[in-house]
Amino acid sequence: MSNIEPTHVLTQTVKELSETDTLKGLCHHHHDGYPLPSGKALEEIVDLSRAIIFPGYYGKSSVNTQTIKYHIGVNAERMQKLLYEQVLAGLCFGDMCEKPDDNKFIELRKQAETISIMLVSMLPHIRNLLATDVEAAYNGDPAADSYAEIISCYPVIKALTNYRIAHELYEMHVPLIPRMITEMAHSETGIDIHPGAKIGEYFTIDHGTGVVIGATCIIGKHVKLYQGVTLGAKSFPLDKDGKPIKGIARHPILEDNVVVYSNATVLGRITIGKSCVIGANTWVMEDMRPKTKKYKKIKKDIIDIQYNNGTGI
């Protein structure tokens, strides 16, 4: 070990790591002058959006009726600026131009400006949706003492705030950035919602950890999920090269007032009708008619144990 030359090892390692064959699909060739997506900037965008949507619960400043307009204005202006930069970075990632000063880049800048302004203009609508989610979470959990507790503590509201912002960006065909925003919530809360999913009003997830909602899911109003639920794809067709065909509908549709209990798995492009109930640990891969219930059959093994003097426990 003492004969190893650090300089030689580093030189050889860098050479191997820089070989083109090892970088296929793993290296993004960035042109000078193009912005790069920034996780830190996106985290600030999420923080600002939470402070705007739930003033007084999030943010660095105290808010009252006299100062609320000022604080929302400052945060919205900052958010729009950061959004412009990050949307532009996403657009450049998805549509690489040859030079940063070419006509295409100028067009992408205009597009990013429009998208960032549109997203900020949608914040009242997003707040209205999230208000219904807060109400659903509160009404669905007897352990919750107040809306304040729901907004401040419950992971579902954090995850849905990220999702509802990311979904609007996804609908405006912004590359990369929507997924980065929802994956931040995934890391923070354990709730994995693809930004392409369509989710209606009054949606809630109790506890939340381990929930997966796929890209082509459609979820109606007043739907409630519990922890560990998967709304996933059963299978997907492959092209002639054996690769998955992208963009096809492959995840479930949950109509209004559906309840799915913990660790249930619902797979494929099936429809779960209105007011259905799916029990815990149940697998569902077929349509369910409205107002039907599906539970996993439990095998009951009765064991008679006599505990004499604690039996050593």
Where are these predicted regions, by residue range?
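Terminal amphipathic alpha-helical/low-complexity segments used for targeting or macromolecular assembly
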Residues: M1-M180, N309-I313
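Structural signal for interior beta-strand "rungs" in well-ordered beta-sheet cores
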Residues: A185-I302, Q306-Y307
